[in-house]
Amino acid sequence: MSDKKRVLVKFSGEALAGDSGFGIDTAILKFIADEIKELVTNGTEVCIVIGGGNIIRGVSAAKDGIIRRTSGDHMGMLATVINSIAMREALERGGLDVRVQSAIKMEAICETFIVGRANRHLEKGRVVIFAAGTGNPFFTTDTAATLRAIEIGSDMIIKATKVDGVYDKDPNKFKDAKLLKSLSYEKAMSDDIKVMDDTAIALAKDNSLPILVCNMFKQGNLLKIISEDAKALYSIVK
């Protein structure tokens, strides 16, 4: 493996939707692509996982029982493929070499996930987008992102959100909410702090994978995090 820093960045599908709450806002897509390009230009090996909540959520689709949970989750996996293709387009328009790898075989659209091939792409400076979650129902894209990060030997997983990091309570509801700069995996799970679901956190803990939570809309913040800039704004779970 290369000596370069390797990171997996996890974006929610809702983040792509912008104010509309549904679909894909191409202005946001371009903003994210520019932030990723900064990392690649500065020598970082980057892979990405995007949720599908801007299109459909498996849990929500199955809520009234008309659609089975397994089918709902498969629909959600397909939504992540749509988002991944959109992100590939934005990154390629920015001059980057990109590959989408899906956990579910769909040769006409993208590659099938193979860890060795993903590693080779990253070593060649390509951005790799992992789509379709784990390929199995009942697992979130946070868990999929953690799994892929471990499989490809990522130094960290960055969860890009709409807030500056992890707070002791909801900063949108409480003005006195405090940003937690660092917390343990155990605290993140026991206090039910919504960093990721418990399966993802437990997987990260078992493999000593740091989880960094940051605001995706702070321009240049991703690069500051990777560069270990003191001005970087994030929380770390380790």
From Swiss-Prot:
Q: What does this protein do?
A: Catalyzes the reversible phosphorylation of UMP to UDP.
Q: Which family does it belong to?
A: Belongs to the UMP kinase family.
Q: Could you tell me which pathway this protein works in?
A: Pyrimidine metabolism; CTP biosynthesis via de novo pathway; UDP from UMP (UMPK route): step 1/1
Q: State what inhibits or activates this protein.
A: Allosterically activated by GTP. Inhibited by UTP.
- Looking at the record's lineage, which domain of life comes first? Bacteria
Query: What are the binding positions for ATP in this chain?
Result: K10, F11, S12, G13, G53, R57, T161, Y167, D170
Record's catalysed reaction(s): UMP + ATP = UDP + ADP
Tell me the protein's name. Answer: Uridylate kinase
Predominantly, its location class is cytoplasm
Q: What is its EC number?
A: 2.7.4.22
Please cite one Gene Ontology biological process associated with this protein.
Answer: 'de novo' CTP biosynthetic process
